[in-house]
Amino acid sequence: MKDCSNRGKLMIMIGLLVIAPVTILSFYPQDIGYAAFFLLPGLLSVLAGGLVCAFGKREAYFSSDRLTAQRHSNNTVLFTWFWGIAVGAMPFFLSGQLRFVQSLFESVSGWTTTGLSVMDVTQTSKIFLFYRSFMQYCGGLGFVLMMVMLVSGKRSMDLFNAEGHPDKLMPNLKQTAQTIFEMYIIFLILGTVAYVVCGMPLFDSLCHAMCSLSTGGFSTKLNSIGEYRSLPIEIVTIVLMLIGTTNFAVLLLLIRGKWRQAFHVSEVRFLFLLL
């Protein structure tokens, strides 16, 4: 994919993300009838991305004009988010779970980790509950960051900045993206285990860990974590949300044991002041 345009790469990645929930069907075979509603838009996005890579016009990232290059990066990120929202809405709409506008609303809320929902979770199948949580988890990372983790190009930094990431953990951008992703995965595993230890079922634990880390707010329960009436579960949720809202550079300092240096960061001080 080295010579592929960044828009094409991102379209392919979004398609794969939409297909990903199909992997849980081995655990919930009763939802197999919904598989086509994820595979169809996902594969079409992958195909469209492949066509853009093969025949599309390369972005003008090699202009000597820095402003022009940054403008193209901004346009690519803007296009990617609109594409992600449109493709992400399709499983809800094609399956008849939601009307078209409602599907777009749910997709926007999921990818942007806003947390507002129009779905009745008490009547929703497992695959859609997982999909909503997975959208928030991926949205918390950002499409561009995930792409940079897999492939890097000469203008990856422009795209990275255009999506609004302040974290520069490593000298190399790809290493930065991989470090953030690894931390995000580790926190997800730890959060899921913590929920299970506190008495939450495994499926709900995974979904709530994804939504808490992204500070998104989706839930598999009508009353969210209040459904469990458990102080330990609420404490785990608070900790995960604090982790999710903290700069990854600060988290890396804490992981490396540089506590004093971390608490000198103004962002951390202000956070504790608010708490």
Question: Which stretches of residues belong to each language-model region?
Answer:
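Membrane-proximal intracellular helices of multi-pass ion channels
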Residues: M1-L275
